Regions:
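Peripheral docking tails and interdomain loops at the edges
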Residues: 175-191, 197, 358-406
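Mobile, glycine- and charge-enriched loop segments
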Residues: 82-125, 266-308, 399
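Local cysteine-cluster metal-coordination motifs and their immediate loop/turn environment
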Residues: 17-28, 45-59, 143, 148-157, ...
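Short Fe-S-cluster ligation motifs
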Residues: 50-61, 84-86, 229-245, 263-268, ...
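Cofactor-cradling patches in redox/metallo enzymes
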Residues: 119-173, 303-378
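A short, flexible N-terminal coil/short beta segment enriched in small residues
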Residues: 36-38, 62-94, 249-281
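Gly-rich Lys/Arg/Thr-decorated short loops/hinges at beta-loop-alpha junctions or inter-strand turns
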Residues: 1-6, 111-117, 147, 216, ...
Length: 409
C-alpha cells in the first residue's frame, strides 16, 4: 500500500471504550488488540473496508470515509424530498449491478414497488442498526434489505450480521406497534444465466470454471450447480455463443452501454474519452456516482463482477467505438474476493496485450490494482492515465478494422 495513502477507516482512540466488539466481529482479523491495555488498532494491509466494524461500534469511535451514518441519513432525507417515496431498498453491490433489475428482484418476491429509494452498498453488513430507526424517523414506511445468500457474501459475514440486526430490529419495531412488513429481507445472489438452446457442447466453461460449478454431461449440454456458482464471469468469457452469461453483465448489454456513451460524448466534442472497466470491489466512489466521473474527467465507468470477467473483446471494441483510452481497475491478488482462477484473468490480459500490440494500440490501455482502503488512489491513477491519453492525438479507427482476432462471431 502507498505510504502516503489516506486510510479509509480509523479508530478514534479518545472515544474508544476498549470493548473489543470490533476486534471480535471483523471477518478479516484486521483489528489488532493489545491484551494488556485493550487498545485496538486497524491493520490496513488486511482491512477490506467492509464497514462491519464501523456499524458495530456502540460509541461510534470508528471513522469511515464511505457510507457513514450521517451521509446515509442525508441521502435518504434528500431522496424523500425528491421522490416522495416511502420505501427504502437497501441492496448489496454484489446482487445489484448499476444497470438495475431491482424491480424484477422485488417482483419475484411478490413485492410490487413502483417508487422506491435505492441505497446501494458494498455490503449489507455495514448498515448500523441506528440507521434503520433513523430512516423510519425520516418518513420511511417500508425498508427492504436485498441480501446476498450467506455463502455468496463477498465480505464473508456481512449477510449473516445484517440478517441478525434486521431480525432484532423487526422484533423491537413490532413491540412498538409497527407493522410486520415494515422490515423485509430478500435473499438474492447474482449468478450465471444459461441458455441451453445456444450451447454447442464445447465444454470450455467446464474447463475454465475455477469453482467446479459446471459439470460436463455425456451426450448433453453441461450442467450448472447454481449452489456452487459465485458469479465470477470466467465462463462467460470463453463461451463462443454467449450461451452462459452473468445476469446484469450480458455481453450485448455492456457493448451497447459503452457504444452509446461514446457516440454521445463524441457528438459533444469531448476529448479525450476514457472508458474504465472497474471491478465492483476495487473502487466505491466512481461506481456510486458515475455522472460525476463523466463530468470531471469525460470518463465512463463500467462495472465488472471480478477481474476474471474483464473481457478482452470489450477493451478492443471500446477503442473502435470511439474511446481514446481504456483503463481497467481491479483488486490485487491479496484483496480479490474471488481468488480462485486468478491465473485465468492474467492469461486473458496477456492475450489482450498481444493483440493491442499488433494493432499499435497497447499504449491506449492500462491495468491498475486499486483498493478502497486508500482514499483517492483511484482518482490519482485516473489522472495519470488521463494526462497520458490527452497527450496523444484522438484515436480514429476505421470501422472495417473492428473485425479483429479477439471479436466474438
Amino acid at each position: 500500500m502507498n505510504e502516503t495513502c489516506t486510510a479509509a477507516v480509523n479508530i478514534n482512540q479518545d472515544y474508544c471504550g476498549r470493548c473489543s466488539i470490533c476486534h471480535s466481529i471483523c471477518p478479516y482479523e484486521a483489528i489488532k488488540r493489545d491484551l494488556e491495555t485493550g487498545k485496538v488498532e486497524i491493520d490496513l494491509q488486511k482491512c477490506q473496508v467492509c464497514g462491519i466494524c464501523y456499524s458495530a461500534c456502540p460509541v461510534m469511535a470508528i471513522d469511515i470515509v464511505y457510507y457513514d451514518y450521517d451521509g446515509l441519513a442525508k441521502y435518504v432525507e434528500c431522496m424523500h424530498e425528491k421522490t416522495g417515496s416511502e420505501t427504502l431498498v437497501l441492496m448489496c453491490r454484489g446482487n445489484s449491478p448499476a444497470t438495475g433489475e431491482i424491480e424484477e428482484i422485488l417482483q419475484n418476491e411478490g413485492l410490487k414497488v413502483d417508487n422506491y429509494i435505492p441505497l446501494r452498498l458494498p455490503c449489507s453488513g455495514r448498515i448500523p442498526t441506528e440507521f434503520i430507526f433513523k430512516a423510519l424517523k425520516l418518513g420511511t414506511k417500508n425498508i427492504v434489505s436485498i441480501q446476498c445468500e450467506n455463502e455468496f457474501c463477498r465480505f464473508k459475514q456481512g449477510t449473516k450480521i445484517n440478517a441478525q440486526r434486521i431480525m432484532l430490529s423487526k422484533a423491537l419495531l413490532q413491540q412498538l406497534g409497527f407493522s410486520e412488513d415494515t422490515l423485509k429481507v430478500v435473499k438474492y445472489s447474482r449468478k450465471v444465466v444459461y441458455e441451453t438452446e445456444k450451447c454447442v457442447g464445447c465444454d470450455k466453461c467446464v474447463f475454465i470454471c475455477p469453482y467446479g460449478a459446471i459439470e460436463a454431461q455425456e451426450f448433453a449440454t453441461p450442467k450448472i450447480t447454481y449452489e456452487v456458482c459465485v458469479g465470477c464471469g470466467a465462463c462467460a468469457l470463453v463461451c463462443p455463443h454467449s450461451a452462459i452469461q452473468v445476469k446484469g453483465f450480458e455481453f450485448e448489454d455492456v457493448l451497447q452501454r459503452y457504444s452509446k456513451s461514446a457516440e454521445r460524448l463524441k457528438a459533444e466534442s469531448k476529448f479525450p474519452l476514457i472508458l474504465v472497466f472497474c471491478c465492483q470491489w476495487s473502487e466505491f466512489t466512481a461506481l456510486d456516482d458515475p455522472k460525476s466521473l463523466t463530468l470531471k474527467k469525460k470518463a465512463i465507468a463500467i462495472e465488472i463482477p471480478c477481474f476474471k470477467a474483464l473481457d478482452p473483446v470489450h477493451v478492443v471494441e471500446s477503442l473502435h467505438s470511439g474511446f481514446d483510452g481504456v483503463m481497467a481497475v481491479v483488486c490485487s491478488k491479496e484483496d480479490c474476493k474471488l481468488r480462485e482462477g486468478g491465473d485465468t484473468a492474467e492469461r486473458n490480459i496477456d492475450v489482450l496485450r498481444d493483440v493491442l500490440k499488433k494493432m499499435n494500440l497497447l499504449e491506449r490501455f492500462e491495468l491498475f490494482t486499486v483498493s478502497p482502503r486508500c482514499v483517492g488512489e483511484f482518482n490519482q491513477k485516473l489522472d495519470v492515465f488521463f494526462k497520458k491519453i490527452a497527450s496523444m492525438p484522438p484515436l480514429k479507427l476505421a470501422v472495417a478494422e473492428a473485425k479483429n482476432p479477439c471479436i466474438k462471431s
